[in-house]
Amino acid sequence: MSNVVPTPVSPLFAQPFATRLERALQHLRIGRPVILMDDFDRENEADLIVAADKLTVPVMAQLIRDGSGIVCLCLPGETLDRLELPPMVDSNRSRYSTAFTVSIEAREGVTTGVSAVDRVTTIRAAIAPGARSGDVVSPGHVFPLRAQPGGVLTRRGHTEGSVDLAALAGLRPAGVLCELMNADGTMMRGASLERYAAKEGLVALAIDELAAHLQARGATGAPAELAVAA
């Protein structure tokens, strides 16, 4: 179960899931971020996610300012294959098999690559229709993640959740995320997460809720199905 139990006891989950999901999809369509939480016995993390299609420089600055600074671009395998981005390591021994590729930078239009403007430029280059390997270089300051086929029905990760939500919103199946952190460097959870969500006016969803929603509708996680499963 998620760190903040999805009952009316927590203001994050005071509204029914269907209501929060519709609000979240509306926010993603206009470029606003959404909080996505995983299970308590997994990473126990709250990530700030945004649809890559709608990413803006101010939102990127928010991800960097309020998160860990490690901004990830979550993409389906076919997009990463077209960009010819290999895995970061040959043998992935991380606890949850998080599928990092080599980091990237836009080939053109960036300076150091680390500013909010430069990271947005890199992400736009990577998700552009027809983007190819020559449009990005490695290493860089954006960290692509390979979403597993089947989305959260296959792997209960933020990577898959962000791609699934973008597809549910009718957008390109590509998400951008960063783990939320407190000012003291600890992960943002519990009461501090509730305060942050209230201050920023953000919707929160849990991955287990999203998976249950998709299972109930018989979705397989394919982007075309997700676009009509909301």
UniProtKB/Swiss-Prot annotation:
Pathway: Cofactor biosynthesis; riboflavin biosynthesis; 2-hydroxy-3-oxobutyl phosphate from D-ribulose 5-phosphate: step 1/1. Its EC number is 4.1.99.12. Binds 2 divalent metal cations per subunit. Magnesium or manganese. Its cofactor is Mg(2+); Mn(2+). Keywords: Lyase, Magnesium, Manganese, Metal-binding, Riboflavin biosynthesis. Pfam families: DHBP_synthase (PF00926). It catalyses: D-ribulose 5-phosphate = (2S)-2-hydroxy-3-oxobutyl phosphate + formate + H(+). Catalyzes the conversion of D-ribulose 5-phosphate to formate and 3,4-dihydroxy-2-butanone 4-phosphate. NCBIfam families: ribB. This is 3,4-dihydroxy-2-butanone 4-phosphate synthase. It comes from Bordetella parapertussis (strain 12822 / ATCC BAA-587 / NCTC 13253).
